[in-house]
């Protein structure tokens, strides 16, 4: 194991009956990083988290924690804690008692418990809430208590299984920022599970995109968004225009009946590829100046931008723009070479 890795998953396979949930999955998780397991329902992300936590056992493969294989170590002996979507707080205990519960089980001296609980209350911005009943708290406050209860035990890794899923959109966005701040203050590893692309892009140092029990791509939010490894990632992370094309040569691609400059190289000459263009990367120009040209067939106001469909003989293009366009009008679309992303063509996708 490399010195900066805290967890290694090596060839993890897990099945339930005839259904393979994880298929020979391997993953390195670094110390002090915020890593997100992202994917649709049933992709294996929560099962991966449970295997790390010790709540599930892999059929084969190794879970390595700080150079030690921990497959047979029970959850309560692993140096990590888990926060679930259902916070499982004790309703008969107040905020202080909930946070202190794990420390009391370990028979930590009362003065140290008091010190640690106060530190956690400050960390999660709940100072003064010590004596509040759990049921008197908002959803966001309950979540903060659950996080404090997990962190007060000083785990080296915090596992979070869709903890924001039950919150409304405004509170969810606020808690995304708060969670990232907490992780940065503590400097420990967070492993976060979600199906929400915005959550992953907002909080993560590293995103692991999963589908059907396999890792599709692993990288920074910028890499995942700007350079998707395949069609699944391109479609799952944000909105994309995906079209077939031909890589004519290094830095030269043909699609939509036109030839474009691009920044990609290393493909075979005349190789069939797929082109990804994000809707926000199109620029609307006069019809006669367009690299691509078409007719506006739909326009929807999305608040911060309009979503516009432009159709021509080859394709229907989706673009996001702050400018309005009339349905039926003819417009041109312009692209920078950096906005054209080339992917290997996958016949089975």
From Swiss-Prot:
Role of this protein: Part of the ABC transporter complex PotABCD involved in spermidine/putrescine import. Responsible for energy coupling to the transport system.
Keywords tagged on the record: ATP-binding, Cell membrane, Membrane, Nucleotide-binding, Translocase, Transport
Subunit description: The complex is composed of two ATP-binding proteins (PotA), two transmembrane proteins (PotB and PotC) and a solute-binding protein (PotD).
Primary location: membrane
Xref: Gene3D superfamilies: 2.40.50.100, Nucleic acid-binding proteins, P-loop containing nucleotide triphosphate hydrolases
The enzyme's E.C. designation: 7.6.2.11
One GO MF term: ABC-type putrescine transporter activity
Protein name: Spermidine/putrescine import ATP-binding protein PotA
Organism annotation: Clostridium perfringens (strain SM101 / Type A)
Membrane-protein topology: Peripheral membrane protein
Catalytic activity: ATP + H2O + polyamine-[polyamine-binding protein]Side 1 = ADP + phosphate + polyamineSide 2 + [polyamine-binding protein]Side 1
């Amino acid at each position: 194991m490399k010195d900066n890795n805290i967890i290694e998953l090596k060839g993890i396979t897990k099945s339930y009956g005839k259904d393979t949930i994880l298929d020979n999955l391997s993953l390195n998780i670094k110390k002090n990083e915020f890593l997100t397991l992202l994917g649709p329902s049933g992709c294996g992300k929560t099962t991966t988290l449970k295997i790390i936590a010790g709540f599930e056992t892999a059929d084969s493969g190794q879970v390595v924690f700080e150079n030690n294989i921990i497959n047979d170590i029970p959850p309560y002996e692993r140096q990590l804690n888990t926060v679930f979507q259902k916070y499982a707080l004790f309703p008969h205990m107040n905020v202080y008692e909930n946070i202190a519960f794990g420390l009391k089980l370990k028979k930590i001296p009362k003065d140290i418990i008091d010190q640690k609980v106060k530190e956690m209350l400050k960390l999660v911005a709940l100072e003064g809430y010590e004596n509040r009943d759990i049921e008197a708290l908002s959803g966001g406050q309950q979540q903060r208590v659950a996080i404090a209860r997990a962190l007060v035990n000083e785990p080296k890794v915090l596992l979070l299984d869709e903890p924001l899923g039950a919150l409304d959109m405004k509170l969810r966005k606020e808690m995304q920022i708060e969670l990232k701040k907490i992780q940065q203050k503590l400097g420990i590893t967070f492993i976060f599970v979600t199906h929400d692309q915005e959550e992953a892009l907002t909080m993560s140092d590293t995103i692991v995109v999963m589908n059907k029990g396999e890792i599709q791509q692993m990288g920074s939010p910028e890499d995942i968004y700007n350079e998707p490894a395949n069609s699944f990632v391109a479609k799952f992370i944000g909105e994309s225009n995906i079209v077939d094309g031909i890589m004519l040569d290094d830095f030269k691609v043909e699609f939509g009946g036109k030839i474009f400059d691009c920044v990609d190289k290393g493909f075979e000459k005349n190789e069939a590829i797929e082109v990804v263009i994000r809707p926000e990367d199109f620029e609307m120009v006069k019809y006669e100046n367009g690299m691509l040209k078409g007719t506006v067939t739909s326009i929807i106001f999305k608040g911060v931008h309009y979503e516009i469909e432009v159709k021509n003989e080859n394709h229907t293009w989706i673009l996001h723009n702050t400018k309005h366009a009339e349905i039926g009008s003819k417009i041109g679309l312009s692209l920078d070479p950096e906005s054209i992303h080339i992917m290997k063509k996958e016949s089975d996708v």
